Amino acid sequence: MAKSELKRKKHQSGNEEVKEKRQKPLKNDKKIAEELPQDEDDYEQEEENEDADQNTSVESESEELDNENEDERVQKSVNLNASSTSDIEKFSDLQLSENIQKAIKEMGFETMTEIQKRSIPPLLAGRDVLGAAKTGSGKTLAFLIPTIEMLYALKFKPRNGTGVIIISPTRELALQIFGVAKELLKYHHQTFGIVIGGANRRAEADKLVKGVNLLVATPGRLLDHLQNTKGFVFRNLRSLVIDEADRILEIGFEDEMRQIMKILPSENRQTLLFSATQTTKVEDLARISLKPGPLYVNVDSGKPTSTVEGLEQGYVVVDSDKRFLLLFSFLKRNLKKKVIVFMSSCASVKYMAELLNYIDLPVLDLHGKQKQQRRTNTFFEFCNAEKGILLCTNVAARGLDIPAVDWIVQYDPPDDPRDYIHRVGRTARGTKGTGKSLMFLAPSELGFLRYLKTAKVSLNEFEFPANKVANVQSQLEKLVSKNYYLQQSAKDGYRSYLQAYASYSLKSIFDINKLDLAKVAKSFGFAHPPNVNITIGASGRTDKKERRAGYNKKNHVDVYSKQRSSAISQDKERGWSR
């Protein structure tokens, strides 16, 4: 009995000693920062020198330290940010660490946007936030700055595992968030990583096991790692960010998000949920992810428009058979500008890119059926270009911050006003951004303008004189009829366009029965409508499993694409008529 008591006292004494050592460094953050390893190799070496028991002990101690330091940080942040957000205009007004202030300054940011002014202070104070803001409002910095500051304040190291998880709906948006996080973490020692569908899963798992403090992820791949990657430490999670929540749910990740919420620890976790629209599903997700009584930040309520200032918006009424001619003429006149053209289906984008590149009008294309590496390369190539044309589906419509876009062209109109708002949000971004948008509408589709007006979006009608539109219809039809592979691509594009049109939710406006198929066929280069098989009324969206697999018909498609590319190249060498 006495021996047991002696052992217990000795254990208590040891704990007090550990606690004293643990508390002491809190008085000198700068000294601790200087003692931290300088790169990931140091982290890895440190982990290799610890056995499993020591690592468990360190992680357990780290949890206690985090909780203690977090209470101190939250109280400090509440006191420092108690003043009205109207007093805070610049990032330098925030009580941030020197390292992150330096990174923000080097990135060229000085004045905060409305969403940043209203959300960063309460986030620094530890509040859960449900944010609503139009695209291009600066949400990325609004959630990255507080979460990185938290990691720094809690002295996260690789052995502590993941402290921040940011969930994004698309791979491109995840890559973009990752890029911004990398710049903000330039002067920090915390580790960061990204896990997305289409990337090398084993390489991701290896990095997670080594320790990733800030993780950017898409829902499907994140759930995979949470369930199957042994050694992925996420018990110390302190901040969860759900970006573009409405989009995540729209594209079919509702079940995955519910499973993720069940797996992730909720104790001591701050949650940030950003959504451009507040739907019933978003409210349900907020209910299971946020603590009761979150701070609701809506910077759009009461504003006269749903799109950003500095954006000049217009539409043009054009018959289906003249759509390509107008697009071709418009792009030829804007070769020195940066232009994004939205289309409704992957096959339409693919065909139009092949066609335009063939007739020496260089374009890039981005859609969901491309391999991930190509999508990534295309995205960054267009981001870094001073001028150029990008043809894409809605994969690029949400959240992506592409610099200096001059024109957004909606060649195929969107399914609803929300999609319109997100598409045009690729231009006129930031506090002083400017840009223009143009939407093509058939005479039968003009009723869509009423829906836009209800959503606080007003457009002016643009007119293009007929003598300014190049009439290349006969050359187009001749080219498509002579080139077999281009003809097959045109058929695929035509079929997928009709399938997508049939899936539109606003049937009173976008009624496939009102389409003049002969005119639609001409816009794809056919003199007469080709015979294609479509199911009217079926969804034009790909199945979720097919989408996650990256379009699993890859063997057939890859061979077909190579043959077509080779044939088109041979045609050009022969100097076929254009």
UniProtKB/Swiss-Prot annotation:
Keywords from the named record: ATP-binding, Helicase, Hydrolase, Nucleotide-binding, Nucleus, Phosphoprotein, Ribosome biogenesis, RNA-binding, rRNA processing
Location of the motif DEAD box: 243-246
Molecular function terms from GO: ATP binding; ATP hydrolysis activity; RNA binding; RNA helicase activity
UniProt motif (Bipartite nuclear localization signal) ranges: 322-338
Catalytic activity: ATP + H2O = ADP + phosphate + H(+)
Feature: compositional bias, Basic residues: 1-12
Basic and acidic residues bias: start-end ranges: 543-561
Cited SMART domains: DEXDc (SM00487), DUF4217 (SM01178), HELICc (SM00490)
Database matches in InterPro entries: DDX18/Has1_DEADc (IPR044773), DEAD/DEAH_box_helicase_dom (IPR011545), Helicase_ATP-bd (IPR014001), Helicase_C-like (IPR001650), P-loop_NTPase (IPR027417), RNA-helicase_DEAD-box_CS (IPR000629), RNA_helicase_DEAD_Q_motif (IPR014014), SPB4-like_CTE (IPR025313)
Helicase ATP-binding domain location: 120-296
PROSITE patterns assigned to the protein according to its UniProt record, in alphabetical order: DEAD_ATP_HELICASE (PS00039), HELICASE_ATP_BIND_1 (PS51192), HELICASE_CTER (PS51194), Q_MOTIF (PS51195)
Localization (cell): Nucleus, Nucleolus
Region entry Disordered, spans: 1-81, 543-578
GO BP terms: assembly of large subunit precursor of preribosome; maturation of LSU-rRNA from tricistronic rRNA transcript (SSU-rRNA, 5.8S rRNA, LSU-rRNA)
Catalytic activity, EC: 3.6.4.13
Top-level taxon of origin: Eukaryota
Subunit structure: Associates in the nucleolus with the 60S and pre-60S ribosomal subunits.
Function: ATP-dependent RNA helicase involved in 40S ribosomal subunit biogenesis. Required for the processing and cleavage of 35S pre-rRNA at sites A0, A1, and A2, leading to mature 18S rRNA.
Protein name per its UniProtKB record: ATP-dependent RNA helicase has1
Biological source species: Schizosaccharomyces pombe (strain 972 / ATCC 24843)
Taxon lineage: Eukaryota, Fungi, Dikarya, Ascomycota, Taphrinomycotina
